[in-house]
Amino acid sequence: MFRQLDYQDRVLDSLDAYLDALNEKKGRADRVAEFALREPDLALPIPDFVEEAWEDLRNQGRLPVSRATIPFSRRIDGCDRPVPDVVLKVPTGGGKTWLAVAGVSRIMGQYLRSNAGFVLWIVPNEAIYTQTLKHLKDRQHPYRQALDRAAAGADRVLIMEKADRLDARDVESHLCVMLL
């Protein structure tokens, strides 16, 4: 029987806090962007909602001690828009795969508010690749069951490998997880 460990609960609680802060700050940034479109002569800057969420967590003491003094590191997309990112640092044997599937579920539900999308799952070596692929394809395994819940059904999850064909229609209608 699978049992989530206390420190995994703490890691996921921190992720939940970050996603909540992102939602709040993104809502505000979206409202500013809408107003700026209606009033272009005001030249309003659009807030970086990701940095604001990070700073909120820092001010609340919710960042890990190892990250609290490190400056915010901005990530942007090709259109110069802020992009949130998450790194979960967990020791060997610490349940990183479980945290990853639980994290995907939370990100899909709490932040993206979608049951469909694309996840690129990168593993460090062939042994972990083989093991992870086996678990993600096994509908009886807790990892796969967490993904099934995130996608609102087992028939809505596609576990893919790099040689598999990726189609936009699949990404729009399924949770596509490509393992590399």
Question: Whereabouts are the PLM-identified features?
Answer:
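RecA-like P-loop NTPase motor core of helicase/translocase proteins
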Residues: 1-180
